[in-house]
Amino acid sequence: MPYTRHALREYERRSRVEQVLPPKADIFAWTRYAAPEDIKVVILGQDPYHSRGQAHGLAFSVNRGVPVPPSLQNIYAAVQKNFPGAPRPSHGCLEDWARRGVLLLNTSLTVRSGAPGSHSSLGWGRLVHAVLARLSAESGPLVFMLWGAHAQRAFGAAGKRHLVLTYSHPSPLSRAPFVHCTHFAEANAFLEQHGRGGVDWSIV
């Protein structure tokens, strides 16, 4: 894809003069865990965490051993409210979700260290839009979770056979407390209704 090559060239240029996150080997980590036909849920984020050691290519996820960020703590709280009795995870690595068919995709795949939103014009958005469009056309039925105005603006449209869920961003600064978000239970009900099986939202 020409826009992917453009984004990679711009990434290479910037990485020579600034620290870029996540590490290059993890930029496309979101492609490693499930085949397109096995994707059940898409959670769309904005850009990677901008502190060193956090981002590893999955939206909202951090490496093991890194403190769980406030946004992810709020996501975990919502999961527990959706499924009473669910254990609270002890870390913030969401690879288990990714292996179970949850695509954790940011609209920008890289960021300059310490500068949120700094790579929003790099060109990743066109790649992400193409990925979402192809999934919408060829996979599913799918559940799209769009948290916050940025994700909702970036998403575009999906076919009628998919379920699109919107809510405020899980950031503690958001107006609506994310703990009241029922997307996880809604997603499972939709997936089970369409014969795809719900997602196990536990993290081990």
From Swiss-Prot:
E.C. no: 3.2.2.27
Recorded GO MF terms: uracil DNA N-glycosylase activity
This protein's GO CC annotations: host cell nucleus
Task performed by this protein: Excises uracil residues from the DNA which can arise as a result of misincorporation of dUMP residues by DNA polymerase or deamination of cytosines. Therefore may reduce deleterious uracil incorporation into the viral genome, particularly in terminally differentiated cells which lack DNA repair enzymes.
UniProt enzyme class: hydrolase
Entry's family note: Belongs to the uracil-DNA glycosylase (UDG) superfamily. UNG family.
Record keyword Cell inner membrane present: no
InterPro entries membership: UDG_fam1, Ura-DNA_Glyclase_AS, Uracil-DNA_glycosylase-like, Uracil-DNA_glycosylase-like_sf
Subcellular location(s) of the protein: Host nucleus
GO terms classed as biological process: base-excision repair, AP site formation via deaminated base removal
Main location: host cell
Catalyzed chemical reaction(s): Hydrolyzes single-stranded DNA or mismatched double-stranded DNA and polynucleotides, releasing free uracil
Protein's UniProt keywords contain DNA repair: yes
Name the UniProt record assigns to this protein: Uracil-DNA glycosylase
Active-site residues per Swiss-Prot or TrEMBL entry: 47 (proton acceptor)
Cited NCBIfam families: PRK05254.1-1 (NF003588), PRK05254.1-2 (NF003589), PRK05254.1-5 (NF003592), ung (TIGR00628)
UniProt-listed Gene3D superfamilies: Uracil-DNA glycosylase-like domain (3.40.470.10)
One Pfam family here: UDG
Name of the coding gene: UL2
Keyword annotations of the record: DNA damage, DNA repair, Host nucleus, Hydrolase
